[in-house]
Each structure stands twice: as C-alpha cells, then as structure tokens.
Amino acid sequence: MFDLEYQLKNLPDKPGVYLMKNNLGEIIYVGKAKILKNRVRQYFQKSQKHSEKVKAMVKNIEEFEYIITDSEIEALILECNLIKKYRPKYNILLKDDKHYPFIKVTLAEDFPRVVSTRKVTKDGSKYFGPYVDGSSVKDIIELIKKTFPIRTCKKNIVEGAKAIRPCLNYQIGLCKAPCAQYIKKSEYREIIDDVIKLLSGKHLDIVENFKLNMEKAAENLEFEKAAMLRDKINIIEKIGEKQKIILNNFDNEDYISLYSDGKDTCFQVFFLRNGKIVGREHFIIEDTFDTNSSTLISNFLKEFYGGTAYIPKTIYVPSIEDEALLEQWLTLKKESKSTIKIPIKGEKKNILVLVEKNAKTTLENFKLKYLQEKALYDNVLKDLKNILRLQEEPIRIEAFDISNIQGFDSVGSMVVFEKGRAKPSDYRRFKINTVKGADDYKSMKEILTRRFQHGLSEIKSIQDRKLEFSSGKFSVFPDLILMDGGKGQINIALEVLNTFNIDIPVCGMVKDNKHRTRGLIYNGEEIIINKYGSVMKFITRVQDEVHRFAISYHRSLRGKNSFHSLLDDIPNIGEKRKKDLLFNFKSIDNIKKATYEELLSIPSMDKKSAECVLEFFK
C-alpha cells in the first residue's frame, strides 16, 4: 500500500520529474521540479493557495512516482517526453499536435525544386513558413510553377550529366529542361533567386523587373510576350497578397497570447515570417479555472513546441514562468539560439494586444456555438430517456451493424456517440471469423460477444494494474445499445449481455419499406417518434453513421481482395518484389516464362525468391 506521508518525507533534494496517479494507477499529471521535495510537498500543503484545477487534481491523487535527473533542463526534456507519452488528464494537451507545412527550395541540388514539406532539416535547403493553411502552400507552389520555368520532377539532375529527353512541361514552356542540359546551372539559379525573393516578401522588385520587360515587349510589338508577362505580374501580386505585411523588420517570430474567462482559456498564435503573417492558430483548453497566465503560457509553450516542426528565432509572450529554462530548452531543440521576449511597449506589444483580442473573440464564439449545441444535445438525450423510460440519460450510446454482399467478407461495425456527439476515436471494426455465408444474426452475436469479452478482460487488467485505464479500447460500457434492426437483432444482443451478466438497455432502430428510419423498438414494443423532431433526427444520424462505417470497411476489404494476385501466394514474394516483377515483366505470363537468370536480374530479387517463383510456376 502507498504510504503518502512516508513518501513525502523521503522526497530527494534534487531536480527531477514527478508523476501523479489516481486510484486506478492512471497517470493524471506530469510535472518537473528544480527540487523535488519542495515542489511535490506543495500540492499537499493546505496553506498553499492552489487554483481550482490543482485542487481538483489533488483530490484524485492516490500515489506518485518520481524520476531524479542531473539538471533542471534534463527534467524539462523528460517532462515533455512523458506528457507526450501518457497524455495526462490535468496537463495542458493540444488536440492538434501537427507539423505545419513549409515551402522548401532544394538549394543543395544543382537544379533546385520548390516543394511542400512538414519537416525542417539541415539539408542545405531554404525553408519558408510555417503555413497554417495547407491549401495555401499548394496554391503558392502552383502559382510559382506557372510563373517561373522550374523543374517539378524528382530526378537527380546534375550539370554536365548525360542528357535525357525532356518531358511535356518543356514543350509547353513550364520548364527549361535541365534534364536535357538545355540550361546552365548559373542561369537556372537566377530563376531560383527570383523565387526566393518572392517567398521572402520582395515581390515588388520582381514585379518592377517584369513590368520593364513587358513595356519593352510592347514597344517591339511582341504583344503575345507582353500579355504573358502581364499575366505573370498578376500571379506574383496574388502571391504577395496572400501574406499581409505588418512589420518592417525581417525576423522569424511567433506571437503568443491568451484569454481566459475564469473557466476555459483560448491560446492564439500568430506566425510572422519575414515581416508577414503567414498564418495563425488557436487552441482552446478547458477547465483552466484561475490558473495564472504565466503558468498557462509556460505549459502551453512546452506542449506546442514539443510537437511542432519549427521553432522561430524569437517568441513574444505577455508573461511567462521559467523563462530562462524554456529558452535553454528551445535552443537545444532548434540547435540555434531562440529567445523569449516580453514586450512592454511599441510595435511588438501592439501585436500581442491584437493576438489577445483574437483569442477573446475566438473563445466567445466557441462558447456560443458550444452552448447552443450542448443545449440541443442535452434536450435530445433527455427526450430519449423519457421516451424509453430509462433511469438515466444515455450519455454513451453504442450502435452496431453488419455488412455483407452475397455472404462474402461479412464485417461488423460499432460507432459511439457521447453526449450526443459522434466519437470516431472509439469506433471499432470487426471482421467476422466464425460465420460462413450471409447470417446477420450469428455475425452480430460474434461481434457483440467479442466487444464485451474484450471489455471485461480489459476491466480486469485495469483492476490488476496490468493496463492503464486510458489504454483500454473496450473497457467503457455504453448506457444504451442501438441495433440496426428489429426484434431479432435485439434478442441477439440481450442473449449476449445475459451470458456476461451485463445489464444495458437495448433498443432497435427500424426502417420503413423505403429504407427510412421509422421508429424504435424497446421492450418488445415499437415506439412511434415524431419524424420531424430532434430525437428522430438523432436516431437517423446514428443509423446512417453505423451503416456508413460498416459499408466503408466492407469496401476496403473488397478493394484489397480485388488486387489479389497469383504472386501474393508465392513464398518470399512481398509487395516490393511483386511490384518489381510486374513492372519489369509486364504480365504474369511473362513471369511464368522467365528464366532463373532473368528473375535474378531484378534488383529486389535474391536466389531464394527466384527459386520460389520457378517452383511455384513449375
């Protein structure tokens, strides 16, 4: 048994990381400390003025662990890694831990390309971004390709190498064909320099140059060339308009601020690159209550830059905790100096005020929409409870369906709705293993048995501390089961539940002769529901969703089967070798006729795999 008092007395006087756990052994909070004994003890001292969030967390702490580190920076790095691994309930967690897209100019190549990427590496390329809007990156690259005759192929083209035949892009004037050695490296680099100028915000210089050339072309009566240059000027100006200039300097900077309403907090981030806003992003964190802004921003930075691909040169914030330590951590991650600054006045301060205003507006709009949706869903669940005469509102609803075509590839699906909203992360698919042919009842019995068998097994593992509560895929049981069918399907579900001594209400969703949702069957009776009411709309949505999910899984299995080849049945022939054989020999018949030497001439083939092919077609 965990002795809290004893463990608190024996905490070390060293830096490290502490992990708070609840009565299920689940990690609910990860923190770092300069001195472990001071930091951890603070949580359990009544004299401390804790925030509401910390008070709620402390009530749930059953035990804790700690890991000693050599320094505070090591503790910070370990803290970030453990938060990412365990996703604890009381840490700030960003739902969207994504890498933003960048525009990459591959300067390490003799003839560089302009591509989109989500990884920034030290490979000699020049990167522009990040861009929050992925479609914006795609649009800019497409506009660049229309304006500048640069290559788009992935070939390794070196100046002075053997010339190859140019592709269609050369024929239509979209590429200078470096592959055919039609342009020198130095001449091509001049084009790339213009692209870099454009992406760096110096598009006015390029426009001016194009205008001079357009005027010369018009004077020489080269009207077609002048029109082409005019179109390119329009494209360049369009790219320039996609990014609003708000600063005169050309640093890479992020501006981060927040707005709290006493319960929840919205963080807003503005990305400035070369003096231009290239994007902004917001994150809403619930139940922050009265946690102070400095702590919130410090925790947000750890989560945000722990997952994003790019750390800028300077980060501006209104206030922050552990500023020097976070700067050290960011610099280590970036592998070059990164600074956190708190502007007091001037242009930078004005931008932070603007960011905070955006955060306030975003949170208010979110709350308005959320409250409207919550009221709607609350009413639906309340009405559903009353219609079915349930003891409690069905917070978690699971719906099941079977899909098959002519008895082949029967599959089952389970969709989940929590508080009236679909929860795709809890959806599950089942491939039917024990039933041959089209038997929906037996198939349904199989998937329900597997669902609740897994659930009971996981619950036991959680109770035995062999599995964390958050790791269970089936351990949370529903308040209501909806079957896509009538009395037969309901009886199957009740039979399975009785086998496991589980008491969950089961309801059937029935359709009319036009395959439209008609009503519900519960306790052997059909309940007619107002077809224009919110409950009917909700039931129809659930029924459509479970059917869609089952059909999509069925299609994916049929798709895989349709691509089955004789080569799939040959030992030692995987996907790579299969593709290589078909690419080189063009057909199964040609592979059958191939000699041992011809098979070995394929780079991915070895002696054993060649022998397997010959043996198979003998």
UniProtKB/Swiss-Prot annotation:
Domain UVR: 204-239
Classification via InterPro entries: DisA/LigA_HHH, GIY-YIG_endonuc, GIY-YIG_endonuc_sf, GIY-YIG_UvrC_Cho, RuvA_2-like, UVR_dom, UVR_dom_sf, UvrABC_protein_C
Subcellular location: Cytoplasm
Main location: cytoplasm
Keywords: Cytoplasm, DNA damage, DNA excision, DNA repair, Excision nuclease, SOS response
PROSITE patterns xrefs: GIY_YIG, UVR, UVRC
BP terms from Gene Ontology: nucleotide-excision repair; SOS response
Superkingdom to which the source organism belongs: Bacteria
Keyword Lyase: no
MF-aspect GO terms: DNA binding; excinuclease ABC activity
One Gene Ontology CC term in the entry: cytoplasm
The GIY-YIG domain, residue ranges: 13-92
Any Pfam family hit: UVR
Subunit field text: Interacts with UvrB in an incision complex.
Sequence similarity: Belongs to the UvrC family.
Function statement: The UvrABC repair system catalyzes the recognition and processing of DNA lesions. UvrC both incises the 5' and 3' sides of the lesion. The N-terminal half is responsible for the 3' incision and the C-terminal half is responsible for the 5' incision.
Name this protein carries in UniProt: UvrABC system protein C
Organism: Clostridium botulinum (strain Okra / Type B1)
Lineage summary: Bacteria, Bacillati, Bacillota, Clostridia, Eubacteriales
